[in-house]
Amino acid sequence: GYKAKTKLVSSYAWDTTIAFLQKVNSDYGSSSEEGNYNDTTFSYTDITGATKTKAEGSRVLVPTGQTTPVCNIYDMGGNVWEWTTESYSDTDSPYAIRGGNYSGGFAVYPAGVRTYSSDSAYDSYGFRLTLFM
């Protein structure tokens, strides 16, 4: 199985995240599948623990690849809040973060929760970079 020895990228504000992603895109180009995404939904209520992240509620940032894979996808929720391109209506912040983080519990931060603070950078804020091959 997949055993990454790294942690998710964290401590980035929205503008720093976008600058990094633009640099990566200019270095590697884009693919024909650039618009694809994982649309699998899941909840944190599975009593077997199969859909719970190891990091959620652990109070520490956990290395990637240590969760139980669901649909062969690792670390799709929890650990760090992830920046999205979704707008957060009724606020001054143009972008939303979602997914919960390591400092909260399952009941506090389910996968669908969104919040905002696009000018902030905390160790619990991060992003996911996907490379299509």
Spans of model-derived segments:
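Short aromatic-cysteine micro-motif
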Residues: 1-75, 133
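Disulfide-stabilized, aromatic/cysteine-rich ligand-recognition loop
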Residues: 4, 9, 67-68, 90-133
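Extended alpha-helical regions
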Residues: 54-61, 81, 105, 125
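Residue-level recognition of short, solvent-exposed, well-ordered loop/turn junctions
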Residues: 75-76, 124
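Active-site-proximal beta-strands of protease catalytic cores
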Residues: 77-86
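Short, well-ordered loop/turn and helix-capping segments at boundaries between secondary-structure elements
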Residues: 23, 86-89
